[in-house]
């Protein structure tokens, strides 16, 4: 005899309702959140512009079908593309994420909340261009900043206590959910329609972490966020037509997300949605490196300077010991061959060896031309990592959110340097005063990669004037980035 399952349509899951109520009703009052969102916007766009230097990224950009023309389509910064909002979202977020140089959120689940900008910016630009064509008011960049804060918050708050990586799911599912909610609200959907849209995001089959880990690490990790944001825009547009949703997408017995994909567990929440995530987000300012290694790379750069002063080189190194936190060991402690740039930028041994050898770590250092230097792999073999439980505890402490690494170098002559400890990277909220000037310099460098001096200055004049930027129509701001 089969078990009876009621066919009474349930109310929407509380987790979905909370997301929708937040995007529709929450008023952002935090000055710190808006200040940070402003810098986050600049940094994120700059990361996308740098990615245009890499053919592996550029080959994925443009319309799905060459020659497609979209009247009043969304612009893709640094290109001549004008696309439908779904494909524009893919283009923008793929650029943003390509070099692993945009922001980071570390918690039970990791991720990069500025990945959401692709969907937000593409939708806002498309809506603005169509509004102007119809004689109506466009959206402003202040609305983009508000959308960023809310997308950051949804992705980051769910990530605080819920480890999707533990069940093999990729964090871009949170990009899809967050972008769907924010974009749906931006599109003017009703509450019921946004509920439907968010439920559609949860019932999608979710991306696996296969492409982020040995032996399959590959470039999908660089366009997975673009895939997620484009899907979000697609689902929001479907919901706008009146497409139905699935109220117990998470909790349905046997067939819901919890039973199918989360081992029957339900989500835990540390705090209500507000503006906490944007206020505390981590910027990758100095090095394009997986964030659990940022402080290790900074320590390695300090050690390189000490070696220079002492007349030593990496050839004199006998052993390197890295005292670290558990998440670092689980994600980027990697031995054996590294097959491509995506493999290398997720290997702490590689990311420490390069600065110890050359006194630098740039995106180009992950390419084959640099990686074929046999000294790198030779030094990797001398690097040993172990967990310090205190570092792990500080990593999970919501009041600290430290990402500590400490490095000791021993030399073949029996000497050693004192351990270099870095607990907070320069992109951490505790080091904003140090970090923001460097972030702006990073933005300027990335503008110079794609634009002539006059165009760079036009972009900077608006971008660094917060009041002017916030009032500017989205379409006019993105027009500044046309090649």
Swiss-Prot record:
Pfam families noted in UniProt: MmgE_PrpD_C, MmgE_PrpD_N
Gene Ontology terms, MF aspect: 2 iron, 2 sulfur cluster binding; 2-methylcitrate dehydratase activity; aconitate hydratase activity
UniProt-listed InterPro entries: 2Me_IsoCit_deHydtase_PrpD (IPR012705), MmgE/PrpD_sf (IPR036148), MmgE/PrpD_sf_1 (IPR042183), MmgE/PrpD_sf_2 (IPR042188), MmgE_PrpD (IPR005656), MmgE_PrpD_C (IPR045337), MmgE_PrpD_N (IPR045336)
Keyword terms, alphabetized: Lyase, Tricarboxylic acid cycle
Pathway connected to this protein: Organic acid metabolism; propanoate degradation; Carbohydrate metabolism; tricarboxylic acid cycle; isocitrate from oxaloacetate: step 2/2
GO BP annotations listed: propionate catabolic process, 2-methylcitrate cycle; propionate metabolic process, methylcitrate cycle; tricarboxylic acid cycle
Catalyzed reaction equations: (2S,3S)-2-methylcitrate = 2-methyl-cis-aconitate + H2O; citrate = D-threo-isocitrate
SUPFAM superfamilies: 2-methylcitrate dehydratase PrpD (SSF103378)
EC number(s) on file: 4.2.1.79, 4.2.1.3
Function: Involved in the catabolism of short chain fatty acids (SCFA) via the tricarboxylic acid (TCA)(acetyl degradation route) and via the 2-methylcitrate cycle I (propionate degradation route). Catalyzes the dehydration of 2-methylcitrate (2-MC) to yield the cis isomer of 2-methyl-aconitate. Could also catalyze the dehydration of citrate and the hydration of cis-aconitate.
Assembly: Monomer.
Record's protein name: 2-methylcitrate dehydratase
Native species: Salmonella typhi
């Amino acid at each position: 005899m089969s078990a009876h399952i009621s066919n009474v349509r349930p109310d929407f899951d509380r987790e979905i309702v909370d997301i929708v109520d937040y995007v529709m009703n929450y008023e952002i009052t935090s000055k710190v959140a808006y200040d940070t969102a402003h810098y986050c916007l600049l940094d994120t766009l700059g990361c996308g512009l740098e990615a245009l230097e890499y053919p592996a990224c550029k080959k994925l950009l443009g319309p799905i079908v060459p020659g497609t023309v979209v009247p009043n389509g969304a612009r893709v910064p640094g290109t001549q593309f004008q696309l439908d909002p779904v494909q524009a979202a893919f283009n923008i977020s793929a650029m943003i994420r390509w070099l692993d140089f945009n922001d980071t959120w570390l918690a039970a689940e990791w991720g990069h909340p500025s990945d959401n900008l692709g969907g937000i910016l593409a939708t806002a630009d498309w809506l603005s261009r169509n509004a102007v064509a119809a004689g109506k008011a466009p959206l402003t960049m202040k609305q983009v900043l508000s959308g960023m804060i809310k997308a950051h918050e949804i992705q980051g708050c769910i990530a605080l206590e819920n480890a999707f990586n533990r069940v093999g799911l990729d964090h871009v599912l949170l990009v899809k959910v967050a972008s769907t909610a924010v974009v749906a609200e931006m599109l003017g959907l009703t509450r019921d329609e946004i509920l439907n849209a968010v439920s559609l995001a949860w019932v999608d089959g979710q991306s696996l972490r296969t492409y982020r880990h040995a032996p399959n690490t590959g470039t999908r990790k660089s366009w997975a966020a673009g895939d997620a944001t484009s899907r979000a825009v697609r689902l929001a547009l479907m919901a706008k037509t009146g497409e139905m949703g699935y109220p117990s997408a998470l909790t349905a017995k046997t067939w819901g997300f919890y039973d199918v994909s989360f081992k029957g567990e339900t989500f835990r929440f540390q705090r209500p949605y507000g503006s906490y995530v944007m206020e505390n987000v981590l910027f990758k300012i100095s090095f394009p490196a997986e964030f659990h290694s940022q402080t290790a790379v900074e320590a390695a750069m300090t050690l390189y300077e000490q070696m220079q002063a002492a007349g030593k080189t990496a050839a004199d190194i006998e052993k390197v010991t890295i005292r670290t936190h558990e998440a670092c060991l689980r994600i980027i402690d990697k031995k054996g061959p590294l097959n491509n740039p995506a493999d290398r930028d997720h290997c702490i041994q590689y990311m420490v060896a390069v600065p110890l050898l050359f006194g630098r770590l740039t995106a180009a250092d992950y390419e084959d031309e640099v990686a074929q230097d046999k000294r790198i792999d030779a030094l990797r073999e001398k690097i040993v990592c172990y967990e310090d439980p205190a570092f792990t505890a500080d990593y999970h402490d919501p009041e600290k959110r430290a990402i500590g690494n400490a490095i000791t170098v021993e030399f073949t002559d029996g000497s050693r340097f004192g351990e270099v400890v870095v607990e907070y990277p320069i992109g951490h909220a505790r080091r904003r005063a140090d970090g923001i000037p460097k972030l702006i310099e990073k933005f300027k460098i990335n503008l110079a990669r794609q634009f002539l001096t006059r165009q760079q200055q036009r972009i900077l004049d608006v971008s660094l004037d917060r009041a002017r930027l916030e009032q500017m129509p989205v379409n006019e701001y993105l027009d500044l980035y046309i090649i």
